[in-house]
A protein has these predicted regions:
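N-terminal amphipathic/basic-hydrophobic helices that include classical n-h-c signal peptides
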Residues: 1-16
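Alpha-helical substrate-recognition element adjacent to the catalytic core
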Residues: 14-134
Length: 231
């Protein structure tokens, strides 16, 4: 009996080390930020085309980001913040994060997006850590971008993974774009969520239903767990 309790305690500790890494736009958020911001300057078609090419891996992601932000130069900082504050959270994201956190999981978000949208998201979803880029403002006007997260999102993620002592076999990644695929190198379970074909080809499994809480079923099956699931 004592041996059984000890083993159960060890198993519980191991399970508590599990980590989910999410992409943000198109995964935790149900919109792409810059194309919506571009509507303020009637440049949504131009910005969305560059965004799509970056997501699909057809252009250099960093250059595409710099080009998109440059096209929006001069936008008022208050407008940028207002748009960020009103980005819709993905269906099922709150439920998924709530259940994961209640079960002892850590949650990280790695985004090519920006601090002014990630601060809000971190609070609302109780994320343990976020990595993202920063928009640069000068006298209240959009000036440029500071790139902290490039096309290899695994680089910043590895820093916190090492700090937390996470193991690859205990990590899940949920992503949708070509600029996310290197995250699959550092995880046990890679989920392509409503993703580009390139991402689907490299993922462990895919989820097409627009409900992020359905990843819980996938996680349960893969790790033989019994996390709470939604109907």
């Amino acid at each position: 009996m004592v041996t059984t309790l000890i083993l159960l305690g060890i198993f519980s500790q191991i399970r508590n080390l599990l980590l989910v890494i999410f992409d943000v736009e198109g995964v935790l958020l149900d919109e792409e930020y810059l194309p919506i911001l571009a509507e303020k300057l009637n440049k949504e078609d131009e910005i969305w085309e560059i965004t799509k090419q970056g997501i699909q891996g057809k252009i250099n992601w960093e250059e595409g980001l710099i080009t998109r932000v440059a096209a929006l130069k001069g936008l008022d900082e208050k407008i940028c913040q207002e748009v960020a504050d009103n980005l819709p959270i993905m269906t099922g994201a709150k439920e998924a994060c709530r259940i994961l956190k209640a079960s002892g999981w850590k949650i990280m978000a790695v985004s090519g997006g920006f601090t002014l949208m990630m601060d809000r998201l971190q609070k609302e979803l109780d994320l343990d850590y976020v990595y993202c880029n920063d928009l640069i403002f000068n006298n209240g006007k959009l000036e440029g971008v500071k790139i902290n997260v490039d096309s290899d999102k695994s680089k910043p993620a590895k820093i916190k993974i090492a700090e937390w002592g996470e193991k690859k076999e205990d990590i899940v990644c949920v992503v949708d774009g070509a600029n996310d695929i290197k995250l699959f190198d550092i995880c046990e379970l890679g989920i392509a969520y409503r993703a580009q074909d390139l991402v689907k080809d490299l993922a462990t499994t895919t989820l097409e239903e627009k409900d992020l809480s359905k990843i819980l079923n996938i996680i349960n099956k893969h790790f033989n767990l019994k996390l709470e699931t939604t109907v």
